Structures are given as structure tokens and as C-alpha cells.
Amino acid sequence: MSDKYYRSAYMNVDLNAVASNFKVFSTLHPNKTVMAVVKANAYGLGSVKVARHLMENGATFFAVATLDEAIELRMHGITAKILVLGVLPAKDIDKAIQHRVALTVPSKQWLKEAIKNISGEQEKKLWLHIKLDTGMGRLGIKDTKTYQEVIEIIQQYEQLVFEGVFTHFACADEPGDMTTEQYHRFKDMVNEAIKPEYIHCQNSAGSLLMDCQFCNAIRPGISLYGYYPSEYVQQKVKVHLKPSVQLIANVVQTKTLQAGESVSYGATYTATDPTTIALLPIGYADGYLRIMQGSFVNVNGHQCEVIGRVCMDQTIVKVPDQVKAGDSVILIDNHRESPQSVEVAAEKQHTINYEVLCNLSRRLPRIYHDGDQRFVTNELLK
């Protein structure tokens, strides 16, 4: 990855904010391992730089969704434990062993297939975390008998290590009894067998709202980056999280639309009076979606409307006359009260803050801020 970039749109990522949020969870759960979830490119922030900074601040365990994500971390010097939360094709089992990556066991059948695919030349250990489906209805084992049988199979092989067991809450960010029911179901199943080194069930919402003394690890994701899983969670907790992302574009051109002139595809905006517009070199290919037409961005402290359709690579904004090329524009801000907060963008897009962040594409340079230090990552120039 290069430390150069040649475009006027980029992300600012506050690594100190991420480290502060990590410390929040370490303080809330002092006797538990914090498995920092850095899947989906660390929710859009950049998994390598985030994981490296978290390791420097005490992280010892990461969770990702795919083996590819785990290998990316290994290739860039991340030596901490890594768990793949998704399902690895059984034929690729040796690659996980080679890179010392723990895997999720979603079913007895998967385990049997995985064992068949371990080459005779492999002598390294394979760490396994069994996934229990306690109500999410996705991956995992639903009954105690099968869970016990899977453990028995693992114990037959010296190379296999039953390292963990976990489940995932479906409604931890909402009011209701389902999360408590899932937690008790999880405890009941785990208590019917030998206990592994790691027992974990709390996502960001669960980690903020629940104690879960039965568990000895937590898996915060979105909240590591400074964002609450829902408004309900934000209102229920007194924990202060620090948002870590800004999305910035610099004006590349200004011009005046005369009355009757239109702008962008479909000519959906037509000026009624002489109107100054600014062109921003960012669009839906960067994760700033077409639905953001009609929203507002911060131009030199002025709230300015996005007019016309957002294009693949460009966005048009109605601005004061004094705005000029080179001026900085905030499209997403790292202040929760800002009109450009991630939550405001999520509401405009009829989605959740997770998706807004994950949509920020890899073609955007990431500028990382660590105190007075500044680092640039451009994944297009490797």
C-alpha cells in the first residue's frame, strides 16, 4: 500500500479515538479478552492500520469474517490471535493452519469435511471455535447433543484444539427479552460439555448493555470505531464513544448556473436564479450514494445542499459565491452532533451507521491521525 495519493477526496481516521474506544471496553470488562472485530476492512476504516494500532494499545485477539481478511492481517505483520467468524470452504483448511488462524465450526458435517481436507504433512495445530445458534437463525449448532458430538470429534485428533464456543445476539440493540433468552440458552448448552478457553457472546450492544459473567471474552465491532449500534443503546448507556471517521472532498471547480439551467444526470435540478455551484470529486463509487441528493455538506462552515443526482465520481453542491476551488468540504464528520454525522447519513439512506461506514470504498485514500503523526494508505497504489 502506498503513502501517496492523487485525488482530492479522502477519509480522515482518528486512531486515538479507536484506541480510546478499545480502552472503554477493556475498562467495562476488565476480566475479559476484547476480541476486536476488524472485518469488512475494519468497518471501512482500514483493517491493517487499525489492527496494528490496537495491538500497540493492548489488543491480543482479532475477529474477521473471512480467511482472506485474516491472511491480509498476517501478511502485514499482525501476530495476534485471529478468529474467522464465517465459514471457510473445507478444501482450504490447510491455508488456515498455515497462517495460524482459528476457525468457526458451524456444523458437524463441516467439521468432518474439514478433517478430511487436512493434509498429512500438516503438523501445526488448528484452533476451533464452535458456533451455537441460540436464536439468530444463521450459522451454528442448535441442539446440545450435536454440540457434544462435535466436541467429541475434535478431541479425537491431537492436531485440533477446542479453543472457544460462541453465539451471536439477534436483538441486543433493541428492547425486549430475546437477548436474555439467548444468553440463558447459550449458558445451558455450554454447561452440558467441557468448557474451552474462550466463551463469548457479546457484540457491541451486548458489551455495552450486559455483564454476562459466564463469558470471558467480548466481540465489539461498530462501537470500537465510536458508533453506537442503535439509538436505543446510546440512550441506555452512559459510556462516551469517540467517532473516528471524517469524509472530506476538496472543491475542484466552481461555476454559475443561470436561471433555467440544469445540472447532472436527468436534469433533476434546475436553477431558478443565478446559482453558484461547486463540483466535488467524489461519488457513489466511493460510497457517497445517489440517495444523498438533497442532503447537506459543510463548506467553510456553511451548510450547503447537494443538488442534482450524485454521480459515480462527482457530486454537485450549491454554495455561497465566495467558495473557490481547493476549499475543503466535510461530507461525513466525526462529531455526533454534526449535521454530517454518520447517523444523519444513515437516516438519509434509510439504513444503519454500519452500512454507511462499510460502503466507503477502498479507492478512497485513508489518512490516519495518531496524535501529531499522520500516515497515508492508498490501496490502489500497492
Curated annotation (Swiss-Prot):
Substrate binds at residues 138, 312. Keywords: Isomerase, Pyridoxal phosphate. Catalyzes the interconversion of L-alanine and D-alanine. May also act on other amino acids. GO terms for cellular component: cytosol. NCBIfam families: alr. SMART domains: Ala_racemase_C. Gene3D superfamilies: Alanine racemase (3.20.20.10), Lyase, Ornithine Decarboxylase, Chain A, domain 1 (2.40.37.10). The active site is at residues 39, 265. This is Alanine racemase 1. Its EC number is 5.1.1.1. Pfam families: Ala_racemase_C (PF00842), Ala_racemase_N (PF01168).
